[in-house]
Amino acid sequence: MKNPMIKNGFLLALFALICTGLVAAVNQQTVDKIKQQEQQELMRVLHQLIPDEMHDNELTAQCTLLLDKDALGTDSPMPAYIATSAGKPVAIAIEAIAPDGYNGNIKLIVGISTKGEVLGVRTLAHQETPGLGDKIDLRKSNWVSQFVGKVLGSADDKQWLVKKDGGDFDQFTGATITPRAYVKAVKNAVWYFNNNQAQIFSLPLNCEANHD
């Protein structure tokens, strides 16, 4: 009686081990697929923000990490992708957080030329109200296109406000908090870059190490 019980116990343990291994393998494949999709989406967004004709490098390979809570809206290091032409920096795409969105953090990315001109802005993640605050998503509205070509004259440039506050940027009907937070976050990122270009371009390319 003992031998069959031991045998059955062994078989059950072996079966459980195999099942665990299969689940782990499937989970890893899923994680890898998600990472691959995220990387493809990032590359698509970067090439929208910084046109191919501006640079001759692979943007995702030239990535550094920036840390400034006041400017980037978070305590965490944020990736910045440097565009170069013939080895010389020509533009950058900086990820930032608008911490005061209506429903919490809004993650965005800002393309800026070395002359301080905004090349484009995209929303990477948000939880804003559908039909109201979600107009920050280019798939819902072209609202973010307002930033293209903008420059920041000073830290208190009054143009960098929503129209309700006396600035240049449209707000949403029934939703002012979201665009106000978004404009502020983009402005802060541009101001930070304009005043720290030399330091940023001298930082090590360390995004991959941070993600491991």
Curated annotation (Swiss-Prot):
Which E.C. number(s) belong to this protein?
7.-.-.-
Does the record bear Flavoprotein in its keywords? yes
- Which molecular function GO terms apply here? electron transfer activity; FMN binding
Q: How is this protein situated with respect to the membrane?
A: Single-pass membrane protein
Q: Where in the cell is it found?
A: Cell inner membrane
Q: Which cofactor does it need?
A: FMN
Q: Per the UniProt entry, what are the Gene Ontology biological process annotations, in alphabetical order?
A: electron transport chain
**GO cellular component term, pick one:** plasma membrane
- Give the highest taxon in the source lineage: Bacteria
The record, for InterPro entries, names: FMN-bd, Ion_transpt_RnfG/RsxG
Residues with the modification FMN phosphoryl threonine, per the entry, are T176
UniProt KW keywords: Cell inner membrane, Cell membrane, Electron transport, Flavoprotein, FMN, Membrane, Phosphoprotein, Translocase, Transmembrane, Transmembrane helix, Transport
Give me the segments passing through the membrane.
9-29
Give the family per the record: Belongs to the RnfG family.
Q: What does this protein do?
A: Part of a membrane-bound complex that couples electron transfer with translocation of ions across the membrane.
Q: How does it assemble?
A: The complex is composed of six subunits: RnfA, RnfB, RnfC, RnfD, RnfE and RnfG.
Write down what this protein is called: Ion-translocating oxidoreductase complex subunit G
